[in-house]
Amino acid sequence: MELKVIDAKGQVSGSLSVSDALFAREYNEALVHQLVNAYLANARSGNRAQKTRAEVKHSTKKPWRQKGTGRARSGMTSSPLWRKGGRAFPNKPDENFTQKVNRKMYRAGMATILSQLARDERLFVIEALTAETPKTKVFAEQVKNLALEQVLFVTKRLDENVYLASRNLPNVLVLEAQQVDPYSLLRYKKVIITKDAVAQLEEQWV
């Protein structure tokens, strides 16, 4: 499998031979769906909560007598039937949303995503990703020269200047190879990987 190598202006300058096991795998939509769902579920903080009828601050006085008013019987205003009453089946912050994905599935999923990106010509290789100064304006110009709008950069080791210069750009994300996840790969229109990061990804996932 060959991946296109681009220069600083976004022009194709050559190609890089890569592992077929990682970049030429058949697409498995069901597996990708499961990986992304698990990633998003595991990212949940689980802090949502509502109150039960016992926890809502209301008077326990009976609103009106049981019989003779013609209205439906009612015990207290904290009932779930009442406006501003408690919830019948409230969410609690101790809910566990964790979904486990075994290593074999995760490797296969990452490989199928990278392979599809390569087939769709959304995946490119660049020699290196550096920034002389931690200036967002300068780095934004570099991204503009690459003719990219929404891009994920993957490097072997994150340069401090690159991190500082890119962190305030809304459509740019820079990750180290060991931090790459399925959701980020699919979220961005283009994925640019440095040559040394390609080697590390092959070492990790093949």
UniProtKB/Swiss-Prot annotation:
Ranges annotated as biased composition (Basic residues): 59-70
InterPro entries: Ribosomal_uL4, Ribosomal_uL4-like, Ribosomal_uL4_dom_sf
NCBIfam families attached to this UniProt entry: rplD_bact
Molecular function per GO: rRNA binding; structural constituent of ribosome
Disulfide bonds: none
Name this polypeptide is given: Large ribosomal subunit protein uL4
Family listed: Belongs to the universal ribosomal protein uL4 family.
Alphabetical GO biological process terms: translation
Subunit structure: Part of the 50S ribosomal subunit.
Pfam families per record: Ribosomal_L4 (PF00573)
Keyword hit for Ribonucleoprotein: yes
